[in-house]
């Protein structure tokens, strides 16, 4: 954020950019769909909203991610708005990493979590340019979905006896 604040005056003077004038063009659903569009154009994957899965909150969304051949790659949860039980900031994570059980792939379940300002009832959520950038950045959680590797993490604890 520090760099963004330092760059803001030069961006405003160089590009005559006013965050409040950009906001109406960055409707949350359109930016989310833009992330999906870029992922489709780059990797051929598609996203379909799932309405039959439990959600961490009624405002959250779930999407099935399919490879270009139509095979299931994983599930992506997106949770955009703040609430009392949620920490601040934005991040990506994994509810379940890809694994194999009895020789069969168990697909990952990943999440993108943000704390964008929740709109008033009936109004669209409008993002700042910085928030749109955050959504694209934290959507890098897709690397977990793309992974074809099975990784076993081993934690070693060394004790030093003095």
Map each language-model feature to its residues.
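Alpha-helix N-cap/helix-initiation motif
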Residues: 24, 28, 124-132, 158
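Active-site recognition of the HExxH zinc-binding catalytic motif
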Residues: 39, 118, 123-149
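Active-site-proximal, well-structured secondary-structure segments within enzyme catalytic domains
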Residues: 1-118, 162
């Amino acid at each position: 954020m520090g760099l963004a604040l330092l760059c803001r005056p030069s961006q405003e003077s160089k590009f005559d950019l006013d965050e409040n004038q950009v906001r109406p063009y960055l409707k949350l659903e359109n930016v989310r769909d833009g992330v999906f569009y870029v992922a489709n154009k780059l990797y051929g994957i598609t996203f379909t909203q799932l309405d039959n899965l439990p959600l961490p909150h009624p405002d959250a969304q779930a999407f099935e991610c399919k490879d270009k051949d139509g095979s299931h790659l994983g599930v992506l949860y997106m949770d955009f708005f703040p609430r009392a039980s949620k920490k601040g900031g934005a991040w990506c994570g994994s509810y379940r990493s890809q694994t194999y059980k009895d020789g069969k792939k168990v697909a990952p379940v990943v999440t993108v979590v943000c704390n964008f300002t929740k709109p008033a009832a009936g109004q669209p959520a409008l993002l700042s340019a910085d928030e749109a950038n955050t959504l694209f950045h934290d959507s890098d959680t897709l690397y977990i979905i793309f992974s074809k590797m099975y990784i076993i993490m081993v934690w070693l604890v060394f004790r030093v006896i003095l």
